[in-house]
Amino acid sequence: MGCKVVLGDICSFSRGASIPRARMHDTGDYLYIHYGDLYKGFDLRIDVESPSKPIPFILRGEKVKESQCLKDQDIVYVLTSETVDDLGHAYLFNNPQNKLAVSGTETTIVRVKRRDLVIPAYLNYLMSSPCFIGELRRYVRGMKVFRVHPADVSRIEIELPHIETQRKVVSILDSIYTKQRINTQLNGYLLEYLKTYAKTLYCEYENDKN
């Protein structure tokens, strides 16, 4: 049987570390998940071993709290944005090798404390659903910059199916996600090929004119 739970009873919420881009590097001691990079290269999850775009680093000298460090299967949650539509993006952090990583400014780490009740991957999909995002928007504050406080998120009640049902749902959605990602990459390759081919044709045309 499933159950109804309040998010605050099964998850913890921690603010990310505020570190400017000027102190980010191509190599370093900690992977750093910057808020601005999430919208430009990631969708639903961050795979540390095969990221859809390079993940920057920060150095060990930065002042980072233990609560700001990411663990495998944490959810990187965006609760601050310049538009309401961008609020509530959730990214599952897949880090099976447990590489040192820090969640960045304007992000919140959602960590599942009760894995006997919810699989992190299932919760990530649930938090990305239109129904949940609609509930989240009830708590939006601000005029120019919009925010939802983690304390408000922790009060949201969700209904969870049995763990085995969650595993089946995650398996199906992961399969769809993987196929979608492959198609996106393929479309990107085709677009680059078309641009190159069009440029070649144009050059040949110009040469023939001369």
Residue ranges with predicted function:
Residues A121-D152:
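Short, positively charged
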Residues I19, L100-T108, V140-V170:
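A short glycine-rich beta-alpha junction/loop motif
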Residues D29:
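Short aromatic-glycine-enriched beta-strand elements
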Residues M1-R21, R155-N210:
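Non-catalytic DNA-recognition/assembly elements of restriction-modification systems
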Residues H34-Y35, R60-S128:
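A short beta-sheet element
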Residues I58-E62, T108-R114, R155-L160, D174, ...:
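Short, well-ordered beta-strand elements within core beta-sheets of diverse protein domains
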Residues G8-H25, D37-S81:
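Sequence-specific dsDNA recognition surfaces
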